C-alpha cells in the first residue's frame, strides 16, 4: 500500500476512536451512577436517587416543612448513615418526618450525629389529643431483616418510632425528649410496636412523656437493657380495638424505669376481644414512680380506665419476676384489675416494690400473684 494511503487509513481510525469516546460530562455521569456510596445534602435528592446507591450518607439534611425524608423501598442490603445534624421544617401535619423500608437494611449514625426534630415548636400539652397537628417521627414499616443502631434523636413532636416490621433489631438508640417535661411534650412514646414478628430492642435510652415501649400487637418481641425515664413505663397495650389484637411471646428484661407514672403495665380495652399470652417482665428496677409500680388492668376505654374490667382480652401465661424498687408515698405499689376468668397461669416471684400504698380495689387476682 502506498504510504499516503496508509496515512489516510490511520487518520480515519484515529478520528473514529476520538468520536466514540464519551465527553467529559458523560464520564462524570457514569462515575456517579456506578458509585456505590452516595452522599446527599438534601432530602429530595436522597429520595429521588436512593435506588442507585448501596450506601446512603445523609449529610446535614434539612427536611423541608411538611415533607418526609422518604427512604422506602430501598434495594436489599442498603446501608443508611445519618451524618451531622438532621433537621426538619415546621408545619402542622401528621407526618411522618422519616420513613424507611426494605430488606436487609442497616441504619446507623456517624460519630456525633444528631437527628433533631425540635418538637418544642409543636408541643402544647395536648399531644395527639388536640391542639396543633403534630407529625409522627419515624415509620419503620416493612423494614424487615434489618438493623437500626446508634441513632441519637432529640425532641420528637409526638411518638418517636412506629414499628410494623419482621426481624428488626434496634440497638443503642437514644430518644431524648426531656425538654418536653417543662415545655408541653405529650404522647411522646419511644417505641410503638404493632403487627410485627421478631423485634429486638437493646440498650435503648428513652426520656419522654409517654410509654417507653408500647406493644399493641405482635409476637416474639424482646426488650432488654432499657433505661426509661419521665414517661409512662414499660407497657403491653392497650390491646384491643385494632385490626390485630394479639400479643404473644414478649420478654421485657434487665431494664430501669425512673421518675415515671408507671413501672410495668399491661392494659387491655374494655369490651374488646384479643389475647395477651406468654409475656415475661423480669429484672426491672423502678424508682420515683408516681402512679403504679405494677399495673395490670382490663378496663381501658378511649385511652382511660373505667374501673370495670371485661374478659374479652385474656392475659395468660404471664411471668413477673425480679421487679424491685420504690414508688412515691401516694402511689400504688401493685394494682391488678382482671375480668372474670380472664387472667390465668401467672408466675409471680421476687417482686419487692416499697414506699407506696396497697390497693383495696384489686379484682380477680389470679393464683400466684399478689396485690
Curated annotation (Swiss-Prot):
Residues that make up the propeptide removed upon maturation: 20-34
Q: Which PROSITE patterns match?
A: POLYGALACTURONASE (PS00502)
Residue positions with a glycan: 249
> Which residues form each disulfide bond in the chain?
38-53, 212-228, 338-343, 362-371
Per the record, the similarity remark reads: Belongs to the glycosyl hydrolase 28 family.
Name the predominant localization: secreted
Its recorded name reads Polygalacturonase
Alphabetized InterPro entries for the sequence = Glyco_hydro_28, Glycosyl_hydrlase_28, PbH1, Pectin_lyas_fold, Pectin_lyase_fold/virulence
Q: What class of enzyme is it?
A: hydrolase
Q: Where in the cell is it found?
A: Secreted
Q: What is its EC number?
A: 3.2.1.15
Catalytic site: 210 (proton donor), 232
Q: Name one GO biological process term.
A: cell wall organization
Q: Where are the PbH1 repeats?
A: 95-117, 165-195, 196-217, 218-238, 247-268, 276-298, 310-355
Q: Does the keyword Protein biosynthesis apply?
A: no
Q: Which reaction does it catalyse?
A: (1,4-alpha-D-galacturonosyl)n+m + H2O = (1,4-alpha-D-galacturonosyl)n + (1,4-alpha-D-galacturonosyl)m
Q: Which GO terms describe its molecular function?
A: polygalacturonase activity
State the signal peptide span: 1-19
Which Gene Ontology cellular-component terms appear in the entry? extracellular region
Amino acid at each position: 500500500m502506498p504510504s499516503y494511503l496508509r496515512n489516510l487509513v490511520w487518520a480515519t481510525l484515529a478520528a473514529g476512536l476520538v468520536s466514540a469516546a464519551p465527553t467529559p460530562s458523560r464520564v462524570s455521569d457514569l462515575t456517579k451512577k456506578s458509585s456505590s456510596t452516595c452522599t446527599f445534602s438534601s432530602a429530595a435528592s436522597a429520595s429521588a436517587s436512593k435506588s442507585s446507591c448501596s450506601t446512603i450518607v445523609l449529610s446535614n439534611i434539612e427536611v423541608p416543612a411538611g415533607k418526609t425524608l422518604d427512604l422506602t423501598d430501598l434495594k436489599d442490603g442498603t446501608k443508611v448513615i445519618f451524618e451531622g445534624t438532621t433537621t426538619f421544617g415546621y408545619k402542622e401535619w401528621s407526618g411522618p418526618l422519616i420513613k424507611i423500608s426494605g430488606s436487609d437494611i442497616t441504619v446507623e449514625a456517624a460519630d456525633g450525629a444528631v437527628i433533631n426534630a425540635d418538637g418544642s415548636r409543636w408541643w402544647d400539652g395536648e399531644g395527639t389529643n388536640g391542639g396543633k397537628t403534630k407529625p409522627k417521627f419515624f415509620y419503620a414499616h416493612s423494614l424487615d431483616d434489618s438493623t437500626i443502631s446508634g441513632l441519637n434523636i432529640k425532641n420528637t413532636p409526638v411518638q418517636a418510632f412506629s414499628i410494623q416490621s419482621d426481624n428488626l433489631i434496634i440497638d443503642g438508640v437514644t430518644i431524648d425528649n426531656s425538654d418536653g417535661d417543662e415545655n408541653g411534650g405529650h404522647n411522646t412514646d419511644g417505641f410503638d410496636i404493632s403487627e410485627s414478628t421478631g423485634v429486638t430492642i437493646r440498650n435503648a435510652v428513652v426520656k419522654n412523656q409517654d410509654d417507653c415501649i408500647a406493644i399493641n400487637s405482635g409476637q416474639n418481641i424482646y426488650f432488654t437493657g432499657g433505661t426509661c425515664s419521665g414517661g409512662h413505663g414499660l407497657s403491653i397495650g392497650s390491646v384491643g380495638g385494632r385490626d390485630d389484637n394479639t400479643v404473644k411471646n414478649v420478654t421485657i428484661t434487665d431494664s430501669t424505669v425512673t421518675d415515671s407514672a408507671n413501672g410495668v403495665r399491661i392494659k387491655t380495652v374494655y369490651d374488646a376481644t384479643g389475647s395477651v399470652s406468654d409475656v415475661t417482665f423480669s429484672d426491672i428496677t423502678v424508682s420515683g414512680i408516681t402512679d403504679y409500680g405494677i399495673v395490670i388492668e382490663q378496663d381501658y376505654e378511649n385511652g382511660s380506665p373505667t374501673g370495670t374490667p371485661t374478659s374479652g382480652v385474656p392475659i395468660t401465661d404471664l411471668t413477673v419476676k425480679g421487679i424491685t424498687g420504690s414508688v412515691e408515698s401516694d402511689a400504688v405499689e401493685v394494682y391488678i384489675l382482671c375480668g372474670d376468668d380472664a387472667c390465668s397461669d401467672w408466675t409471680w416471684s421476687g417482686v419487692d416494690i416499697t414506699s407506696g400504698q396497697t390497693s383495696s380495689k384489686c379484682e380477680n387476682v389470679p393464683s400466684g400473684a399478689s396485690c
